[in-house]
Structure formats: C-alpha cells, structure tokens
Amino acid sequence: MILRRLFHVLPAFAFTLFILVLLDLQLRTRSDQKPQNAHDGHQRTTFISETTAENQHRDGAHEKEKAEGQKWTEVRSTPPLELSDIFIAVKTTGRFHKSRLALLLETWISETKEHTYIFTDSPDADISSEGFNVVVTNCSPEHSHQALSCKMAAEYDYFMASYKKWLCHVDDDNYLNPGALLSLLMAFPADGDIYVGKPSLDRPMRAQELLEGNKTRDVHFWFATGGAGFCLSRNLAERMAPWASGPRFEQTSAVIMLPDDCTVGFIVERRLGISMIHSNMFHSHLENLLLLSPSDIPKQVTLSYGWFESKMNSVELKGVFTKDEDPSRFRTVHCLLYPTTSWCPVALKSALSWNQHVMH
C-alpha cells in the first residue's frame, strides 16, 4: 500500500524538480546576458556619438565651404576699374606747349580731360583757361636727368595725394588709348604690386650705384622707358615711398646718376625686388612703328612718333588725313577711335569706331 502511494507521488515530485531546474537555468542565462546587453548598449551609444561627430564635421565643412564661397563672392564683387581710377600724368616742357602738347589736347586728352594731369615747368594761361589740369612744377626746363626726375617726383607725390588706384605716366609725344589701357589694367589683381611697361633695351640696364665712402657697385635692372609710358599700381607706389616720396626720388636718381624712368625701375627691381612686367602694348619713337599692322593699332595702349634719319617714324595708316596734314598719324588714329569728334571728316561719323569694332 505504501509502495503504491510512493509510485503515485514520485512522478509529481520529479516534474516539480524539473520545473525548478528549468527555471534556475533560465535565470542563469539571463544573468549571463546582462553584460553583453550593456556592451551592446555601449556600442549603440558609441555609434550614435560617432554619427553625431560625423554630422558635425560635415556641417562644419559645409559652413567652411559656404564661408569660402561668400569670401570668393566678395572678391569677385570688386567694382570694375574705371577711367576715374587712373591718374594719367603727362610730362612736358614749356617749349612744346604749342606743338606736341597741343596735339594731345586736341586728340586723346580731350577724352580723358578730368583724369589727366599735365606736369610742366612753365605756366600757360591758355591751357589752364580751357579747364585742363596743369601742374606747374619748380623743375628746370632742361632735358637732364635731374630735371626729368624732378618732374617724376612731382607726378608721384600728386598721385599719392589722390584717391586713385593707378599711376600711368606718358610723355608729350605719346597717344594714349584709354580703352586699351583699361583692358590692360583690368587683367591685373586690384591689390597687386604691378609695374608694367616696355623696355627700350633688349637687356637689363647696367649702372653704378654710389655707396658711402665714395665706393660704387655694379647693378642691373629692367626699366620701362618713359617714352612709351608705364603704369604703377597704388600698392606698389606705396611701397616705393622710402625712395620716392618728397625729395627722396631725386636723391635716389642721384645715387645711380640716371633719369626718371631708370630710377623707377631701380627702385622697383633693386630696392623692392619686384620684377617689371613687360608689355608690347606700349610704344615709343625708339622702335620702328611702321611694323605695327593697322588691325593691331586700336589694341595698343600707347603710340608715338618722331624723326629718324630725316624720316617720320609713325604708324602706317591710310585715309582720313594725308601724311602732310597728319605726320604723327595721331589725328587719324583719333578719328578712327572717336569718329564723332567735331573736326573728324563727316564721312566717318556714321561708321563704327575702332572701339566698337574691338568690343564686338
């Protein structure tokens, strides 16, 4: 009887024991899984942090690109160069007022009157009364390097006292094309150290620089001949001040015993270590002007003329005026650039100007 009861109770006991063991195993398994879950949570947190960092980096890069874009836009939005930004200096002397200078006043200076300054050694009531900017210097009328440097010093000081961005120098036997000048200067950075012109030599200038104790040393440098014209940016002109402002320009000229245009090249290349930019758009009477083709003439910044071996050295252009009427060819050039000028032939007034041809 007892044995029979035992057989009835034993299965229930075994089943209960099995349930307890199973529960214990499940609890142990969950306990073992907790660190792994915590590790997974850490991984998720790390991933979220890394993702956030990546997003922040991406956003930062985007903001940097945006800022750079704005900076580029600001650079690109610099107002375009205008004729009013250029200080055009013409060097002359009293004995050429009625000849060389009169031709310039009649032609290209009539188009740039407000921005052109005439540096001379003699007062001229007739020219001043017509509203031209005449600067009468205290310089000698002689064609010596001291007298020439005296006038260049005046040009430099007057430019530095202005608000203008460029100083462009020409002589009284140059024709200046304002449109070509603007096209040239606009190709340069607004804040650059620019010295552009044309050398009269095919090699650097060689000179003797005077040193203390009556010693000298050989120096060589490129310079833009004043007879073809040249331009200086304001940034560069400001850097030239220790050797060019006030009486210093003439003092520097005396150190190398050379005229004004050589002195400019000496200051820029030797004192500042900046190279001159050579341009074939400037022309002096020292070159063969007949080699310029008519189609290229409207693209040139300056032209010139002069006598060479009893022959007139000027550009070759047919029509408008004869060579006897216009030996320099400046009037012919001017009428082709500005056909509506009052004294130009009537036949030209309905034609496209050279300027319009070039722009189109």
From Swiss-Prot:
Residue ranges of the region described as Disordered: 51-74
GO MF terms held by the record: metal ion binding; O-fucosylpeptide 3-beta-N-acetylglucosaminyltransferase activity
Ranges annotated as biased composition (Basic and acidic residues): 55-74
Catalytic activity: 3-O-(alpha-L-fucosyl)-L-threonyl-[EGF-like domain protein] + UDP-N-acetyl-alpha-D-glucosamine = 3-O-(N-acetyl-beta-D-glucosaminyl-(1->3)-alpha-L-fucosyl)-L-threonyl-[EGF-like domain protein] + UDP + H(+); 3-O-(alpha-L-fucosyl)-L-seryl-[EGF-like domain protein] + UDP-N-acetyl-alpha-D-glucosamine = 3-O-(N-acetyl-beta-D-glucosaminyl-(1->3)-alpha-L-fucosyl)-L-seryl-[EGF-like domain protein] + UDP + H(+)
Record-listed substrate binding positions: 100, 172
Cofactor note (record): Has some activity with cobalt, magnesium and calcium, but not zinc.
UniProt cross-references to InterPro entries, sorted A to Z: Fringe, Fringe-like_glycosylTrfase
Positions bearing carbohydrate: 214
Domain of life: Eukaryota
Record-annotated active site: 261
GO biological process entries: pattern specification process; regulation of Notch signaling pathway
Lumenal side: 27-360
Cytoplasmic side: 1-5
Residues involved in Mn(2+) binding: 173, 285
Keyword line: Developmental protein, Disulfide bond, Glycoprotein, Glycosyltransferase, Golgi apparatus, Manganese, Membrane, Metal-binding, Signal-anchor, Transferase, Transmembrane, Transmembrane helix
Membrane topology listed for this record: Single-pass type II membrane protein
Transmembrane segments: 6-26
Annotated localization: Golgi apparatus membrane
EC annotation from Swiss-Prot or TrEMBL: 2.4.1.222
Role, per record: Glycosyltransferase that initiates the elongation of O-linked fucose residues attached to EGF-like repeats in the extracellular domain of Notch molecules.
Annotated PANTHER family: FRINGE-RELATED
Family classification: Belongs to the glycosyltransferase 31 family.
Descriptive protein name: Beta-1,3-N-acetylglucosaminyltransferase manic fringe
